[in-house]
């Protein structure tokens, strides 16, 4: 039912009971009141869902409904007032409604109720529930008339009308194949929290600023923590890939020795020496000597390196293997200790920064 411009449906308490509620309960033909006020089960809907069921489309944020009276118990006058998201709570005392003309008799009662969400938090929704009273005991009241009112701002009402729709947002961030939270995902979570309006958190600027600072601390330290693990994994992978190491090419040079005694009987000769350099990651179990020195042209004054090479080559290969294996085990243990120390340091730094931020805020 569309209202003309300037039309307002604002009946008084006496008009609500005398003109609409009493005919709804007493008369057999109620079409003239049903065209104005719709009949609904009030407690089957949350208050923000009721405006869409009203026949009167108004911008006053007040809606009228007929509702069938349903007692909570077989005896007594207590009614069912529980909805899906909360309940209607009676407040104040019951007020009598008197007829303004004639004998000024009592024609009804008005009860004021407020809607409370689960948990007892009060909302901006209120309801005036009207009951008709009859002089004859044979007249039984079947219907009540409810005036539902939203006392908040219109902008808040537009949000409240959509609050019945449930939105589900996933709080589980994506992970990689190993089930570990990636650094990019971790950073995006913290940045998304920082970009939100502080009023959406707690409403207190100091607490929200502290929350954002803590997120920044976590973001920086988590990135450094994961980077340290990446570097450690690279070191371990290098240690595990020793057999694929290619030895360096031999170095060839010319060494000349000039005699200091000035004798011409022993001519000065040049010695060409080929040296195979020692690799940092030798191939274990190899029978080849670590150093191979070849004297291409012997001379009394040439550099004596052959004996040194022979002594080195006489060293058993098993001893080298055992030492190398021991070194590898020691490096692996050292890597594990490094990871533990970095993790402990990460949590220590995070707690220190957070405590420092708390002191600055307070």
From Swiss-Prot:
The NAC domain is annotated at 3-151
Q: Where in the cell is it found?
A: Nucleus
Q: Which GO terms describe its biological process?
A: xylem development
Q: Would the keyword DNA repair turn up in this protein's UniProt record?
A: no
Q: What is its main location?
A: nucleus
Residue ranges flagged as DNA-binding region: 107-157
Start and end residues of each stretch annotated as Disordered: 240-266
Question: Pfam families from the xrefs?
Answer: NAM
* Gene Ontology terms for molecular function: DNA binding; DNA-binding transcription factor activity
Q: What is this protein called?
A: NAC domain-containing protein 5
Asked whether the UniProt record includes Nucleus among its keywords, one would answer yes
**What are the protein's UniProt keywords?**
DNA-binding, Nucleus, Transcription, Transcription regulation
